[in-house]
Amino acid sequence: SFYYGVMWNKLYRAEVWKLLHYPEGRLHEDDFVAHRLFWRCDKVVCLPDVLYNYRLRSGSIMRTSLKPGAFDAVDGLADRYRFYVENGADRSVIDSAYAACWRRYLFLCAKVRQNPEPQLVKAISKEQFLMQGLISYLPNCRHMKMTEKLSAARWAMMPAESLCPAK
């Protein structure tokens, strides 16, 4: 099953990219595209060889402090969950995508709580609307523990300002 992946370390046939584009102005753009691309593939081959090297550079989204755009990843993962539901994916794939979306959201909320800057708290408030739209599936997800489900419900429903009080 595929519910997490990056695009940079793979080779593709050109035809699987037809009509697929990265969203403009969004961070974590792989989260919006990877599932759609792999859904189109008839066959995926994995090699044990190291053919790519990853370069760490200052200024990349992986090496900078938390910014409101980090919540784009949650939007992409929510899109992935909805895509799998709409296309009749296996229940395990749907549950994995759903859990990945909530876990990313909860991780970012915890990071904001450590450093509740106003623009980050505002980003949580904006994202809560999206997460509230996903909450109805929460009791059915088999890939989340009860403690995660309770935390998800709390972070989706309570005002961000009360969850992340200013220092």
What are these regions (language model features)?
Residues 51-58, 64-91, 105-134:
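Catalytic core of nucleotide-sugar-dependent glycosyltransferases
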Residues 13, 67, 143-145:
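A diffuse structural propensity rather than consistent per-protein peaks
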Residues 89-99, 147-150:
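Structural motif
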Residues 1-45, 59-65:
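Donor-binding/catalytic cores of nucleotide-activated saccharide
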Residues 96-108:
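Amphipathic alpha-helical repeat scaffolds of TPR domains
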Residues 114-167:
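Membrane-interface aromatic/basic loop that binds lipid-linked glycans or pyrophosphate carriers
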Residues 48:
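A cytosolic small-molecule/anion-sensing beta-strand core signal
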